[in-house]
Swiss-Prot record:
HAMAP family: ORC1_type_DNA_replic_protein (MF_01407). Pfam families: AAA_22, Cdc6_C, Cdc6_lid. The lineage of its organism: Archaea, Methanobacteriati, Methanobacteriota, Stenosarchaea group, Halobacteria. This is ORC1-type DNA replication protein 1. The gene is cdc6a. GO terms for molecular function: ATP binding; ATP hydrolysis activity.
Length: 426
């Protein structure tokens, strides 16, 4: 069978890019309060005063990065009409960086031309910070705002979040007013910052809560009006949106919004479901997108999300999951912590991994439960039996095995006949 010719989509998508990651709408809806807070916090800059240091936090997909980009772009546009104010903005995504040193080195290279870039390692930390301060001092600008997205990637090494916000106060930089805007997806990162960093960074904090189903519905309607053929969205006086569509059945948007609201309140996840539903309809050569397409899309998106999160887990967490996987195969779940720990010790020794304490694995189990991979149930057997927790998978065990087998370090655990048995019966 030969390949079919490529042809433009004339039935489903008019502009599918508006549903994909990276698209920046002209208007960000359902974030008016946060945008107003953000703009208010940056007003000192336009008055020529030292900038406030800001900390934005909230789950992935709730509008933090997009809000920041919109407000900062508006500031850059408006400052052109203000005498004596010249703002430069440096944006750095810290997702792949795991130390303050790496953040500082990457910032230095953003200021420098390609021929003068520095290596990411090999300098004393004091020298790295001095080089960064020199670059800030040499700027032909009155203000420099440094936006550090996904700053939680640096973990406990938060030195950069102390030194940069205090660069002016400590006279490390005198001719340029420096402000830091930290953006984090991790609530615990904010709580675990050292006291000196909290005092330095958080002049003002802006919390981006998860979207509810109604808010997600409006976001989806706004995007659907641009994305699909035969579809338009009108903004009403109360700020909500009314959708008219020849190809979207009435339950499509509410279902996408409901699934995403129950999941994490993420606009990104809601848009992925709507996009995948359209994709499925296109593949079927259907003239309409139905609720059935959305339900199928939800299964695919959820599986992909879980797979991605499982893949990014550290080795010790994967070993903990593997231990529960063995107990699941033996039909011994829900299982107590001590049983899981016994399997964990054996597995860790087999791959020459560090064997952590029972308490550490308990913490891992708690983290895996919070992430939604495990369910936990408290058992109370009275004065004689005592109380204890039992754990079992809340995701499909075959998916957990599939991802764990792909990990190079854990692959040998599945090499024997005993552990490579399929989990179709789960």
């Amino acid at each position: 069978m030969g390949l079919e010719p490529f042809s433009p989509d004339s039935t489903i998508f008019r502009d599918e890019s508006v549903l994909r990651d990276g698209y920046q709408p002209d208007r960000l809806i359902e974030r008016d309060t946060e945008l107003e807070q953000y703009q208010s916090a940056l007003k000192p800059v336009i008055n020529g005063a030292p900038p406030k240091n800001l900390f934005l936090y909230g789950q992935t997909g709730v509008g933090k990065t997009l809000s920041s980009r919109m407000v900062v772009e508006r500031l850059i546009e408006d400052q052109q009409n203000i005498d004596g104010v010249d703002v430069q903005v440096i944006e750095l995504n810290c997702k792949s960086l795991n130390s303050s040193y790496q953040v500082a080195a990457n910032l230095i290279n953003q200021f420098r031309p390609p021929t003068e870039q520095i290596k990411p390692t090999g300098y004393p930390s004091g020298m790295i910070y001095n080089m960064l301060f020199d670059e800030l001092e040499a700027l032909d600008a009155t203000h420099c705002l440094i936006v550090l997205d996904e700053i939680d990637a640096i973990g406990n090494d938060d030195d950069i979040l102390y030194k940069l916000p205090r660069a002016n106060d400590n006279e490390n930089v005198e001719d340029t007013l420096v402000g830091v805007i930290g953006i984090s997806n991790d609530f615990t990162f904010r709580d675990n910052l050292s006291a000196r960093v909290k005092d330095s960074l958080a002049d003002e904090e802006i919390h981006f809560p998860p979207y509810d189903a109604n808010e997600l519905g409006n976001i989806l309607k706004q995007r659907a009006g641009e994305a699909f053929h035969g579809t338009s969205a009108q903004r009403l006086d109360d700020g909500s949106y009314e959708l008219q569509s020849d190809i979207l059945e009435g339950d499509v948007v509410p279902l996408c919004a409901a699934f995403a609201a129950q999941d994490s309140g993420s606009a990104r996840q809601a848009l992925k479901r709507l996009y995948k539903a359209g994709d499925l309809a296109r593949d079927e050569e259907s003239d309409v997108i139905t609720g059935a397409h959305v339900r199928q899309a939800d299964e695919i998106v959820e599986r992909d999300k879980v797979r991605d999160e499982l893949t990014r887990l550290p080795t010790q967490s994967k070993l903990t999951l593997y231990s529960l996987l063995l107990l699941e195969r033996e039909d011994e779940t829900p299982s107590k912590r001590n049983r899981i720990y016994e399997r964990y010790v054996m597995a860790a020794k087999r791959i020459d991994a560090d064997v952590r304490t029972d308490r550490t694995i308990h913490d891992r189990l708690s983290q895996l439960t919070l992430k939604g991979f495990l369910d936990v149930d408290e058992q109370n057997k009275g004065p004689k039996g005592g109380s204890y927790y039992e754990y079992e998978f809340s995701i499909r065990a075959d998916l957990a095995q599939e991802v764990l087998q792909e990990d190079e370090r854990l692959a040998e655990l599945f090499a024997t006949d005993e552990t490579s048995t399929t989990l179709d019966s789960f």
